[in-house]
């Protein structure tokens, strides 16, 4: 009786061991599949490239509070070239703008009062996604999208970073729009530093024209960027995560 009972126990133990082995093998396969999926997903994430448009080895100091103190106002603009690149804000691959920076001067109280009176208050800026209209000269750009307006008063004297979520396509230009004024401007630089503004040709230097200028802020419309300024730079950068 005991021997028969022992033989039955042995057979049952063997069957249990086989089931346990199968269960362990299935679990191992599941873990391996999850690990491989996680590795694949991680590789896809790691393959995305982050590009900082407009970045240079050094950033020039903004013009204020030194004299002459200059700021940009009532305009949409973009950098045509800087010391290191042509069209430094042109997008080369599909992706998304994730953040952008402005290097802001700290104007004196009297300088701030002047700009507030001339352009309006408070100092503000936003990003603009532009696409050139083929065959136009002076160039015209379609405003494809734009970011939120940021008030700059709390950040004067700093380099500030703002978050963003703007889709971009190859060929887009990421510009900056200033509804009032922004002391994110350096002048007296080398001849390679050139930027364009959303003003009509012939309305580039007269103070009345500049004051009455209108930034390009209606999405889906076209604007003329007929004014080109040399030896100066708009002090912004844009971080794009490419798809």
Stretches found by the model and what they are:
Residues 4-9, 15-44:
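Secretory targeting and sorting signals
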Residues 45-69, 119-211:
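Aromatic- and Gly/Pro-enriched, solvent-exposed loop/edge beta-strand patches characteristic
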Residues 46-53, 209-243:
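Activation corresponds to long, low-complexity, non-globular regions
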Residues 72-92, 158-160:
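Short beta-strands within extracellular/lumenal beta-sheet-rich domains
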Residues 81-84, 101-103, 118, 129, ...:
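Extracytoplasmic low-complexity repetitive segments enriched in small/polar residues
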Residues 93-120:
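A short beta-strand element within beta-rich, extracytoplasmic domains
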Residues 97-99, 143-146, 236:
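A broad structural signal for short, well-ordered beta-strand segments within beta-sheet-rich domains
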